């Protein structure tokens, strides 16, 4: 329950940064994000473990002005800052996606972005 509370608080915050959830496998990280995603107009879920080909999108320019249209086209879903959630699941499988979080914060802070993964080391 605490996770839902904090994610909801994060969702409503005007001074929001991309969120990175770390934890052991099978503890409910993805579930809590999907449940939070229901509060948005839409959610694009990128699972780097199930769809490794998506890593190619993150192999070049990591700017949101490039990534947002590419992900929208690939998943056939609109990513609208302030209305959409971009969920980068199993993010440890794509180190470039982890790097992209910085650019989402700097260049497109209105887009809600959550990364989740296990075995993340910093």
Stretches found by the model and what they are:
Residues 1-122:
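Phosphate-binding site recognition
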